[in-house]
Amino acid sequence: LATEDESYSTFLEDTFDTICEHFPDYGYSPFMNEKFYKDWSHDLNWGIHQARCVVGHNLKVAWNLTRMHSLKPKESYKVFAHQIADAIPGSGCDNQRGGWYDMMERTLKDGEENHRLVWHDRKAWWQQEQGILAYYIMAGVYDDKPEYLKFAREGTAFYNGWFLDYEEGGIYFNVLAN
């Protein structure tokens, strides 16, 4: 985009239009779909993804949609970004200890009220980064939901409290609830 060559922004616009058209899957799950067959039908059997959600991928799409909305404002970008940002705290966040989970099952089984963790309660540093970026960027650009700033600040506090090694000067890449 720094080249000011219009073909790059047109390419991005086409990419984001495609994301808005095919990734939402709210009739099936609060999480977006990430894997597709050539005809855009959902691939719910691919690798580790299967019928699962990578929380950080959802959050990354939300903040990138917001950035694209700033470049080429479209209601579809704003709506989808908000759908993602509104779904994650209730479905992909550890509301007891803080932080965003790694992978979640995309659907509930009979009788369940909460989405299940795929393997464990791991929280990866990059997932926290995506959440912090998503909620700070959306709070700043849209300024329409005060809870976004709250989620950004809570995510930042969680990251600073659990991922930074204050004794050795390093970082932890993953943390678990225990």
Please give the residue ranges for each predicted region:
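Glycan-recognition and catalytic cores of secretory/periplasmic carbohydrate-active enzymes
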Residues: L1-N178
